[in-house]
Amino acid sequence: MLDAQTVEKPLTHIKSKADLRKEVDASGEWTVSQIEALFALPFNELMFKAQQAHEANFPEGDVELATLLSIKTGGCPEDCSYCPQAARYDTDVKAEKLMGLEEVLEAAKAAKAAGSNRFCMGAAWREPKDRDIEKVTAMIKGVKALGLETCATLGMLEANQAKALQEAGLDFYNHNLDTSEDFYRSVISTRGYQDRLDTISNVRAAGMSVCCGGIVGMGESREQRAAFLARLANLSPYPESVPINHLVPVAGTPLAEQKPLDPLEFVRTIAVARITMPKARVRLSAGRQELGRAIQAMCFMAGANSIFYGEQLLTTGNPEAEQDLALLAELGLKTKQSCKAEVLV
């Protein structure tokens, strides 16, 4: 059941999509109340509107397959409440050194052979040092040479570091907002919200595409989920890739006992993301294994068109590749073939 914070509001105050769109066009931005109104639509109506937005912008209806590799695991000095890689938490994740170039390239070759379009490299750093950037740029060049799109998530970036990654050929840089600004401090204290926005600005200024999303189910209210999506949608331009994670509670972290978000509320979140960011790749990220096949199918109906693909994400499990391909085939969904980066204009 949905909690009191996620119960649908009376429909008397809900405006039509056309009215909402006019207000957005006039102001240039989505408001939290407008996005709350979308959340509160009858489920079938919300799904229909999301499908309309999806089909208008992705008529081919394909699903992008992205593989995520942890190139440097554990030992992070930050205190993100959801993350088992934080050194201060007693989890099963052990600190490891940065992977070598050949090991990364072997993983990228395996990902391409399995059908992935994009290869994402993640490192558990607060921010990379310049010597780290030199090593990662070699990885980027090697992965690009295989014909894969590249993405990296390395923590906060200075402008010169972002430029170095772009010059190496990096297509996307991931830096999530995680949640709404007012809920953020209850989850993280070691990195400010503005720090995240500054990194996104540095990525844009360097000429790379942005991958930016967050995590739902951390105890936030529906209003806070709406505020989170409003902030994403009002970035100019909004992110080309929007990963939406469903919290995976991990033993030893502060959110280990967090009550799961209602699955239908997660589907609503995907639908609202599609409507408010119609040209973005909306990616089902962590937590898919826990959601199961039926909810994932509903997420694809709601406009999700990208998944993290492969048995392991950074530190949490993921459906096996064969299971994903079988589900997509059963739903009649084809996978994205082109490796050309999509850029919003």
Curated annotation (Swiss-Prot):
Pfam families, per database record: BATS, Radical_SAM
Gene3D superfamilies (alphabetical): Aldolase class I (3.20.20.70)
Residues that coordinate or bind [2Fe-2S] cluster: C120, C151, C211, R283
Residue ranges of domain Radical SAM core in the record: 61-288
Keyword field: 2Fe-2S, 4Fe-4S, Biotin biosynthesis, Iron, Iron-sulfur, Metal-binding, S-adenosyl-L-methionine, Transferase
Cofactor: binding comment: Binds 1 [4Fe-4S] cluster. The cluster is coordinated with 3 cysteines and an exchangeable S-adenosyl-L-methionine. Binds 1 [2Fe-2S] cluster. The cluster is coordinated with 3 cysteines and 1 arginine.
This enzyme's EC code(s): 2.8.1.6
GO process annotations (BP): biotin biosynthetic process
Pathway(s) where this gene product acts: Cofactor biosynthesis; biotin biosynthesis; biotin from 7,8-diaminononanoate: step 2/2
Enzyme class name: transferase
Annotated SMART domains: BATS, Elp3
GO molecular function list: 2 iron, 2 sulfur cluster binding; 4 iron, 4 sulfur cluster binding; biotin synthase activity; iron ion binding
Record-listed [4Fe-4S] cluster binding positions: C76, C80, C83
Cofactor (UniProt): [4Fe-4S] cluster; [2Fe-2S] cluster
InterPro entries: Aldolase_TIM, BATS_dom, Biotin_synth/BioAB, Biotin_synthase, Elp3/MiaA/NifB-like_rSAM, rSAM
Superkingdom of this protein's organism: Bacteria
Signal peptide: none
Record text on subunit structure and interactions: Homodimer.
Database matches in PANTHER family: BIOTIN SYNTHASE, BIOTIN SYNTHASE, MITOCHONDRIAL
Job of this protein: Catalyzes the conversion of dethiobiotin (DTB) to biotin by the insertion of a sulfur atom into dethiobiotin via a radical-based mechanism.
Family named by the database record: Belongs to the radical SAM superfamily. Biotin synthase family.
Designated name of the protein: Biotin synthase
UniProt lineage: Bacteria, Pseudomonadati, Pseudomonadota, Betaproteobacteria, Burkholderiales
